[in-house]
Amino acid sequence: MYKRQTQSTTAAVWTYYWQVPSNISSGTTLNVTATATDTNNLPYSGNASLTLTISPTFYLASNGVTVKCSGCSAGDTGMVSGTLYTAVENGTGTNGIKTLVNAGNYNLVTTLVTDMSDTFRDATSFNQNINSWDTSNVTNMLRMFMNASAFNGNIGSWDTSNVTNMGAMFSSATVFNQDIGSWDTSNVTNMESMFRSAQAFDQDIS
């Protein structure tokens, strides 16, 4: 992220840029010292105390599918490819993932979410497109689609590298039969009953 500042003296106008690390959050105060010499060999040195205001950024990930946000808070919104997305957090609060899902809003950016357990449990008519969800920070998918008997959405692009619990994830998801063979399950410690009574599922997950 680059920031720009202009300063002037009686001799010249100085414009300089600096790069702000990605882990710097909005509201951070930085002390900046700039030293320069212009084309006429006129020196300049100055100090400034700056408070950053960083707007959230919604963007399409490099895989061309996942929608992510940087610097966002739950409830922030942003446009990506002509679609308005809302950033959500865990749980059932005002901007919780379960609250918005229950309201029928599936254009969600889930970068802040770590727990997706029971999100679509018993949602027997649910079959919406959620392939763009960012699951890179999710650790818990316990019973996520349990009894979601209509769901057969393409979620093969999900990043599951941090998930530890997939217990009963597709239990009784009777029509689900999508390719999830590329999922990274290296950190999963619980897969108990993951596909129990998932009658249609016959994908290669070896």
What does each of the following model-derived ranges do?
Residues 26-32, 106:
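Exposed beta-strand face motif in extracellular beta-rich ectodomains
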Residues 37-43:
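Short, solvent-exposed loop/turn segments at the edges of extracellular beta-sandwich modules
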Residues 1-5:
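Conserved small/polar residues in nucleotide/adenosyl-binding loops
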Residues 19-26:
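Short, surface-exposed loop/turn segments at beta-strand-coil junctions that are enriched for proline
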Residues 54-206:
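Negatively charged
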Residues 8-19:
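Aromatic sugar-binding surface patches on proteins
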Residues 17, 31-37:
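Extracellular recognition modules
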Residues 43-49:
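Extracellular and select intracellular beta-sandwich modules with Ser/Thr-enriched
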